[in-house]
């Protein structure tokens, strides 16, 4: 092992790699984000290390040291902040609005509500599996470290690199998509008030303005993440308050307004049994240059697959609940509170999402009006038109202001979770420029990781300029890598470390393996749906680039696994070396 990698100072003993030592009563605060000396790192697979949990807040940092890391982040979050991190990142109140028209277009109301029900159940099961893992390994970056442990000594390094790149891609694209959706809700007011200024995504001039506004919103989102950690609690509270107000306004105001419309509510039969197969190309007639129908392009999307595509509108809403795990190093009694944050935020999100989906279905206008409103090409966010139809111009503006502020603050929370993931991955040497990215400020803030998120998200927003379906691709790219990572975790725990994985205080017991099977099957299915095309026939401008992003990121992960020396990969390093290599490294440490 190169001496440059072992020359850091042990904060407990005050001893350097040169062999000199100074006895200290108390170690000075360290901002070094790297691991403890490898010779001191325990192997979590060794006997006597199965339970890595603690029962006292004061032992949180000791638990982190047992996992091999120096505690450098500011630990101040309680269960509320852990819950809010995932709940705000999911933001299903906004998510249902963003994808509602897609859910109806693929299979109709029957497909949409049933897909939401299945998605909710499977997401809760997946969250339970992640919570069990988080309880055993509550560290920043969570899912990346969990992958290393789940894949075992033989495959851990490769799988962790793959999941690290997938997860960082998912969260950075998620940040970009949030800022763009915020801009869409702003510009939707233009078409609502019949302003002649074009707001059609096919207009490149509008996309240029849309891009500028999204970039500005991203800057403010990043700036709010530069505040000292003690102020984050207020951001969490403000975000939760706005989501509560938004939800209450919807469940009270929307049905009251619907009852005053001539058509009133839709029937239960329409909501629960109606199918619609005319939006994704099933009976769409495609003409040639002479205006004659092209038979080969008629009925190009089978009904069964259209039904499956409705899961894009539901699975993409309830994903990202690993956020509580990303801030585990800043959460007190994390082995319990972070795990509960993952699970209960997902349960609550499903209840909110399902209730809103059913509410909106009952409040839908007749099909012609519905099509004119929610498939309005002149509005970047047609759901604003739906509110305008129900609540009137004045009422819908109030609702839209709450929505815009809510999405913006949830973007701030998402950057918080994402920055902890990027920090954790870089401190283990997985990303390029890891030494710089993993540096932490005096206030325990990974500011360089936040800067990296800004740069990547800003570049991703540039896809708005050439593509009219960039937003759809960003949403898919935000969900697809997460589904892939969840599936890989379940696969590894089922087939590689099924009886070896460390146990935490939050456990599923005998239900663990059945839940892992459900997690694996569901997330593989959701992955396929999220990378598939949505507009037919598929052309360059309408292509879903999520599959390209996933493929490119996977290639980068494989290249990094090959190029980056094994000695630079810090997490559980000695689990991947032979006994002779381990002994030689320990001997070098003692020289």
Swiss-Prot record:
The modification Phosphoserine is found at residue 585. GO terms for molecular function: gamma-aminobutyric acid transmembrane transporter activity; high-affinity thiamine:proton symporter activity. InterPro entries: AA/rel_permease1. Residues 1-42 are annotated as: Disordered. One of its GO terms (cellular component) is plasma membrane of cell tip. It is a multi-pass membrane protein. GO terms for biological process: gamma-aminobutyric acid transport; thiamine import across plasma membrane. It is found in: Endoplasmic reticulum membrane; Cell membrane. The chain crosses the membrane at residues 98-118, 342-362, 397-417, 450-470, 545-565. Keywords: Amino-acid transport, Cell membrane, Endoplasmic reticulum, Membrane, Phosphoprotein, Transmembrane, Transmembrane helix, Transport. It comes from the Eukaryota. Residues 1-22 have a biased composition (Polar residues). Thiamine transporter involved in the cellular uptake of thiamine. Pyrithiamine, oxythiamine, amprolium, and the thiazole part of thiamine have been shown to be also substrates of thi9. Belongs to the amino acid-polyamine-organocation (APC) superfamily. This is Thiamine transporter thi9.
